[in-house]
A protein has these predicted regions:
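N-terminal presequence-like segments and the immediate start of the first folded domain
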Residues: 1-53, 60-73, 79-126
């Protein structure tokens, strides 16, 4: 049965969606922007910093459900400029040093709120 996930440790949704949903032992996060828990985006943040903040938001949501980054099965990454891939990839790799999940990374026209990156994840709790 589907259940809605909401934690104060990650930014609130900026639209008509949930931070995450679960069904059985699967957790599906919404795309996480590089917003602080209070919803702020630093205009001067680098792609590295934005990637880290987005992944910290993913981590906070997963931890609220008893999961961790090592439980992530798949991520989807949206970049507003694919030329930032190397900088993104270096920061991303620090969160998944062993047994990284499957991943898709694509360039999109724009990311909400003027961010450079948005990351969603699917994880399993056991």
């Amino acid at each position: 049965m589907k259940r809605i996930v909401n934690t104060d440790d990650a930014p609130a949704a900026v639209g008509a969606y949930s931070q995450a949903t679960t069904n059985g032992d699967l957790v599906f996060t919404a795309g996480q922007l590089p917003l602080t828990a209070d919803g702020e985006l630093r205009d001067d943040a680098s792609v590295d910093e934005q990637t880290r903040q987005s992944l910290e938001n993913v981590r906070a949501i997963l931890e609220s459900e008893g999961a961790s980054m090592s439980d992530v099965l798949k991520t989807t990454v949206f970049l507003d400029d694919i030329d930032d891939f190397e900088e993104f990839n270096e920061a991303y790799g620090e969160f998944f040093e062993e047994e990284p999940p499957a991943r898709s990374a694509v360039e999109v026209g724009r990311v909400p709120k003027g961010a450079a990156v948005e990351i969603e994840a699917v994880a399993v709790t056991e």
